[in-house]
Amino acid sequence: MIRNLLIFLLSFLFLIFDLPAYPNDFSAKVIENYTLKISRKFSNTYCNSTKFGISNDGSLSFSITETNKEFSNNKLNKYIDYELLNKNILLNLENNCMIFNFPEYELENLAFN
């Protein structure tokens, strides 16, 4: 009887205090996909705003602001490789928008917390 009561009590305690384990690290594939998503968003915003007739400086500040706003609260931000992000943005701008003279140093303003 005592044994059954002890088994029931321990089983109950294990079920109550069982906490799921979540990984702190994210896979490289997830981080790479997130970086590509950011670069596509920035590139599309910049392309659309320049095609709409906004100046290059205005398009740049608008694109940086919109991208920062959209991605500022993501947990993956601390894992972003900014060099890879900048290269992806430049490649997207060259391939999709035919913009070859984009000032790379301006991408330093694209930073997430």
Regions found by a protein language model. Give the residues of each.
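Classical Sec-dependent N-terminal signal peptides that target proteins to the secretory pathway
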Residues: 1-23
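Low-complexity, intrinsically disordered short peptide segments enriched in small/polar/basic residues
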Residues: 4, 11-14, 28, 51, ...
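Alpha-helical interaction segments
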Residues: 4-7, 16, 36, 86-88, ...
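Sparse, context-dependent recognition of short Cys/His-centered cofactor- or disulfide-binding micro-motifs
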Residues: 8, 31-32, 78, 82
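Short N-proximal segments of mature Sec-exported proteins
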Residues: 24-75, 95
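Compact alpha-helical subdomains of small soluble proteins
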Residues: 57-113
